[in-house]
């Protein structure tokens, strides 16, 4: 929400949850605490993406659906966002579904569904997921 600070952006969705996460702790884990009083237009695209992820995470969900979370980001920022998602999965125990056209990202998943024309054409379990830091495209 462009007219709210980063902290206010996250606070506004916290009210939708019976058991929200601590906002300051979440801001720290997202690397946004020092930017909490800035407006989204005052930070980078990657930080704006982290804010969007924070709005979803503050509700303490069991499932996070991310549609093209790296689509508009440069390579370095994309990898930072993917590493953040790994951290979210480990720290909060949140299952994450990533929808992407970037096939390289599939290497970090423990399960990959490939779709064609809206139908599942392949369902693969990945026995050895790769860390986001090791991905390259």
Question: What are these model-derived regions, one by one?
Answer:
Residues 75-77:
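Helix N-cap at the start of a conserved alpha-helix in ABC-type nucleotide-binding domains
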Residues 60:
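Conserved catalytic motifs of ABC-family nucleotide-binding domains
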Residues 39-49:
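Conserved ABC ATPase signature
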Residues 64-67:
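Catalytic Walker B motif of ABC-type/P-loop ATPase nucleotide-binding domains
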């Amino acid at each position: 929400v462009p007219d709210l600070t980063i902290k206010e952006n996250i606070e506004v969705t916290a009210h939708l949850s019976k058991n929200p996460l601590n906002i300051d702790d979440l801001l720290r884990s997202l690397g946004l605490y020092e930017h909490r009083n800035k407006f989204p237009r005052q930070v980078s695209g990657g930080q704006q993406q982290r804010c969007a992820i924070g709005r979803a995470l503050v509700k303490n969900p069991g499932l996070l659906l991310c549609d093209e979370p790296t689509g508009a980001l440069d390579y370095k920022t994309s990898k930072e966002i993917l590493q953040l998602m790994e951290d979210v999965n480990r720290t909060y125990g949140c299952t994450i579904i990533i929808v992407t056209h970037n096939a390289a990202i599939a290497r970090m998943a423990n399960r990959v569904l490939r779709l064609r024309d809206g139908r599942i054409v392949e369902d693969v379990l990945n026995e050895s997921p790769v860390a986001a830091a090791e991905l390259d495209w």
